[in-house]
């Protein structure tokens, strides 16, 4: 595994609403750990989008090759800069469904195009299929830093307002994952008639 450079980690995993100066393009990076249920690390790597192939699809290919033994259970933790698009969400659900010996958890730094219905549906589909999607907060950023960054033995230094940004993104994800039936009931309870 080639560890991420510190500057790449801070720029790409930064959860600020706006890119700080100097401006740069935020790309998708996916860092994952493949472990046995008792915690033994089998493999870890950092992936990113490649020529019209999303990082999630590269991840599926890698995991397929590493987990051929279906008698062995595996746990996978993913740290990703952007939450999956609807297509990748669908592919991840199908992959985990076809491989019941795998357990997958996703931690996203930011929500990708979260205001669009299809992207919200993708997140709901992951959640309903038993693939938890959560927002990265300080412990996840620290773990990602320790395991995937060439940090030269320096500890993670949170950027300003990291906690506030995480809480804001978590609230948004919570609203997306709230079943619509609950919202309908809330409107009925308003008794606007």
From Swiss-Prot:
Domain CMP/dCMP-type deaminase: 24-126
Biological processes annotated in GO: cytidine to uridine editing; defense response to virus; DNA cytosine deamination; negative regulation of single stranded viral RNA replication via double stranded DNA intermediate
Known tissue expression: Expressed in peripheral blood mononuclear cells.
Keywords: Cytoplasm, Hydrolase, Metal-binding, Zinc
Impact noted for substituting residue 96 to I: In allele A3Z3; haplotype 4 and 6
Subcellular location: Cytoplasm
Active site per database record: 56 (proton donor)
Metal-binding listed as a keyword: yes
Top-level enzyme category: hydrolase
SUPFAM superfamilies according to UniProt: Cytidine deaminase-like
Effect noted on mutating residue 65 to S: In allele A3Z3; haplotype 2; 3; 4 and 7
Function of the molecule: DNA deaminase (cytidine deaminase) which acts as an inhibitor of retrovirus replication and retrotransposon mobility via deaminase-dependent and -independent mechanisms. Selectively targets single-stranded DNA and does not deaminate double-stranded DNA or single- or double-stranded RNA. Exhibits single-stranded DNA deaminase activity (in vitro). Incorporates into the released virions of the virion infectivity factor (vif)-deficient feline immunodeficiency virus (FIV) and suppresses FIV infectivity, probably in a deaminase-dependent manner (in vitro).
Name listed for the protein in its UniProt record: DNA dC->dU-editing enzyme APOBEC-3H
Biological source species: Felis catus
Gene label: APOBEC3H
């Amino acid at each position: 595994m080639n560890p991420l450079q510190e500057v790449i980690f801070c720029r790409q995993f930064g959860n600020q609403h706006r890119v700080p100066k100097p401006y740069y393009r935020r790309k998708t990076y996916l860092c994952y750990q493949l472990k046995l249920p008792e915690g033994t690390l089998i493999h870890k790597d950092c992936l990113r989008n490649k020529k019209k192939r999303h990082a999630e699809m590269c991840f599926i290919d890698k995991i397929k090759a590493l987990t051929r033994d279906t008698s062995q259970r595996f746990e996978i933790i993913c740290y990703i800069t952007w939450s999956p698009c609807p297509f990748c969400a669908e592919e991840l659900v199908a992959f985990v469904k076809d491989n019941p010996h795998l357990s997958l958890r996703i931690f996203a730094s930011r929500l990708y195009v979260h205001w669009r219905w299809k992207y919200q549906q993708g997140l709901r589909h992951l959640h309903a299929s038993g693939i938890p999607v959560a927002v990265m907060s300080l412990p996840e950023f620290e773990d990602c830093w320790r395991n995937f960054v060439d940090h030269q033995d320096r500890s993670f230094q949170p950027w300003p307002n990291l906690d506030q940004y995480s809480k804001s993104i978590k609230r948004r994800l919570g609203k997306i994952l709230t079943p619509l039936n609950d919202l309908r009931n809330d409107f009925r309870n308003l008794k606007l008639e």
